[in-house]
From Swiss-Prot:
GO MF annotations, alphabetized: ubiquitin protein ligase activity; ubiquitin-protein transferase activity; zinc ion binding
Note from the entry: Present with 1750 molecules/cell in log phase SD medium.
Residue stretches making up the FHA domain: 295-358
Subcellular location: Cytoplasm
Annotated organism of origin: Saccharomyces cerevisiae (strain ATCC 204508 / S288c)
Major localization class: cytoplasm
Tagged with keyword Metal-binding: yes
Family: Belongs to the DMA1 family.
The protein's name: E3 ubiquitin-protein ligase DMA2
Length: 522
């Protein structure tokens, strides 16, 4: 309650800084001055006038700051000197601070009782060395039930106990936030979990599974790599299946890299017989995966770009910038023996393996085994393939480090002869590529000019094509004709004989001169 001050008591003078620094006090002073009341002589006024002023001005002032008007406790507990100077919490910026202090714990209390849990995918991003397994959705996000089964599959890696653990985890609430990367088990395992006793339910879940096909990469120590894939193999002979699944330890070790992962390399296949276009050109693609992994083949979109932005390139899905490739066109699969498979997932334009279509349009295909050197085509040319975005994708498949060329004795001897030739011509025993400044090693494509200088072919290719057939050496500036005709073998033999005869004549002349010099000296 407000306590009036006697008239004979002098009113204290408010500090100048308090009136100038406080914007609310200044506005309050302007309000009182406009009504004919001096704020310094406010104490000399009647109590009724003093009560009327807060009743009319405080409510409007508090509304400007969005403060509730039921803060009577704060205003009643203010000190007398604060009420006199116009700096009470009810009419100054102090009310905002006190209100925030009173209300902040109430707003933050639920957050403290329900802390945010970091998803498993975020733990992968924070980890310096990227860990496996990972899973990416290239299409629509998954549901909460799907994430519950996925989280358990990541922890257990046991297909038989998935249903029991899932029932135990159902009462607990889960986070509905969908992340771009969620660790999970293969989609085929999810099909068995969700499917009921009747076969129709399983078929419907299978259709939904391939509609939201996921990109799965497992580590090298993934158990049951072949079982979790649920392969649907075509009918083959017993001998072929025996050779496929019975791999000795030496062959299996050769198929793996130093981290125990299998690999696949895709290079563009240039069809010389095609008269219209050569297909979509792309840089060689190398992907690595552990047993039981599933690599999605699809179209490059913004969603895919955001999903793979924090994943190493060797674990990316196989995506192309072509309209004839569906968003989830198909997938590669690899089992525990290092065997690779291709599956068409209801693509509209089709998947062709060695010029044979795997399945009709909008239908699933079998898990067809792949062999080293197979030709794979995704889609068909649209509008004649005049635009690059409407061209099909043709590629050659190389499996399990088969493209790695090992330097044998012949390669090393060839490089040694090249270095000896450079030593004779330039006096330098070992010359690096003058374009990229890297060493020339065995099993590399090398271009040797007639002046005995050499470069990597990919480095000098543009210089060769720029003024072909004339070539100007960038090192010594000598010019040569790359289309110059070769001499016949007979002429070469005759030139060799003539050169050998000339050498004999020169040697004899030198011997005769030396003998004359010896005879002349007594």
């Amino acid at each position: 309650m407000y306590t009036p001050i006697p008239a004979n008591t002098p009113a204290p003078t408010a500090p100048t800084s308090s009136m100038t620094s406080n914007s609310s006090s200044a506005s309050n002073a302007n309000t009182t001055s406009s009504s004919g009341i001096n704020p310094r002589n406010r104490a000399s006024g009647t109590p009724s006038n003093e009560r009327a002023r807060p009743a009319s001005g405080i409510s409007s002032f508090l509304n400007t700051f969005g403060i509730r008007q039921n803060s009577q406790t704060a205003s009643s507990s203010a000190a007398p000197d604060q009420r006199l100077f116009g700096t009470t919490p009810s009419n100054s910026h102090m009310s905002v601070a006190m209100e925030s202090i009173d209300t902040a714990p109430q707003q933050q209390e639920p957050r403290l009782h329900h802390p945010i849990q970091m998803p498993l995918s975020a733990q992968f991003h924070v980890h310096r060395n990227y860990q496996l397994p990972i899973s990416i959705s290239l299409t629509a996000p998954t549901t909460t039930d799907h994430q519950q089964s996925s989280a358990h599959n990541f922890e257990g890696n046991n297909v038989g106990n998935v249903q029991e653990s899932l029932n135990q985890r159902q009462p607990n609430g889960t986070n509905n936030t969908t992340t771009s990367i969620i660790s999970m088990a293969p989609a085929a395992t999810t099909r068995n979990i969700v499917g009921g006793a009747d076969g129709s339910t399983i078929v419907n879940n299978s259709q939904e599974m391939y509609k939201n096909l996921r990109h799965l990469i497992y580590a090298a120590n993934q158990p049951n790599g072949t079982e979790i894939l649920h392969l649907d193999l075509p009918a083959t002979s017993a001998e072929e299946s025996n050779n496929m699944f019975n791999v000795d330890e030496v062959t299996l070790k050769q198929r793996k890299d130093k981290h125990g992962l299998f690999s696949i390399r895709l290079t563009p296949f240039i069809d010389s017989s095609s008269t219209t276009n050569q297909g979509l050109f792309f840089e060689p693609i190398i992907r690595k995966a552990g047993p039981g992994s599933q690599l999605v083949i699809g179209r490059y979109t913004e969603r895919v770009r955001d999903a793979i932005s924090k994943i190493p390139e060797q674990y990316h899905p196989v995506v192309f910038k072509s309209k004839v490739v569906s968003r989830t066109h198909g997938c590669f699969k690899v089992d525990s023996q290092g065997n690779w498979y291709i599956k068409d997932v209801k693509s509209s334009s089709g998947t062709f393996l060695n010029h044979q279509r795997l399945s009709p349009a909008s239908s699933l295909s079998k898990d067809t085994p792949l062999r080293d050197g197979d030709i794979l085509q995704l889609g068909m040319d649209f509008r004649g393939g005049t635009e690059e975005i409407y061209r099909c994708v043709r590629m050659r498949i190389e499996l399990n480090r088969s493209w790695k060329l090992k330097a044998n004795s012949f390669n090393k001897e060839a490089l040694q002869r090249l270095q000896n030739l450079q030593k004779l011509t330039t006096g330098i025993e070992e010359e690096d590529c003058s374009i990229c400044l890297c060493k020339i090693k065995p099993c590399q494509a090398i271009f040797i000019s007639p002046c005995a200088h050499s470069w990597h072919f990919r480095c000098v290719r543009r210089l060769v094509m720029l003024s072909y057939p004339q070539f100007v050496c960038p090192n010594c500036r000598s010019s040569c004709d790359l289309e110059a005709s070769f001499e016949s073998s007979d002429e070469e033999d005759e030139s060799d004989v003539e050169s050998e005869g000339d050498q004999l004549v020169d040697q004899l002349s030198v011997l005769m001169e030396t003998s004359k010099d010896v005879d002349s000296h007594p």
